[in-house]
């Protein structure tokens, strides 16, 4: 297992999308799951395309994050702040406020990118609800396919 990662399960083979999640402590699971479903809908992908839910290691026991992983029937992976901060240059929405609290400039986007791998791109940039954030990362080819589909629909 890579340095900085904690995971109770291995990932599903063959799928490529990683859902990065961040939330305040004690955020209702329903809020996080609804936001996660919105991220998938925004990307135009099915829940079955998801292979992993990822977040900051400080949220490794957060019921809402674990509930989201269970809801989508995928494992959860948690990364330390230094691992997420290594992705800062790739974040679409870095936040100094998030950095002050967590030690990294983005939890949802950073976790999605780390979980999806070095060649991954953000498919859905950070979206927010009252108490949570979500982002989706995966292969660059998927983002290109979605752009082509959107252009063809016009």
UniProtKB/Swiss-Prot annotation:
UniProtKB keywords: Cobalamin biosynthesis, Porphyrin biosynthesis
UniProt keyword annotation of rRNA processing present: no
Biological-process GO terms, alphabetical: cobalamin biosynthetic process; porphyrin-containing compound biosynthetic process
InterPro entries linked: CbiG_hydrolase, CobE/GbiG_C, CobE/GbiG_C_sf
Pfam families (alphabetical): CbiG_C
Known pathway: Cofactor biosynthesis; adenosylcobalamin biosynthesis
TM annotation in the entry: none
Protein name per the record: Protein CobE
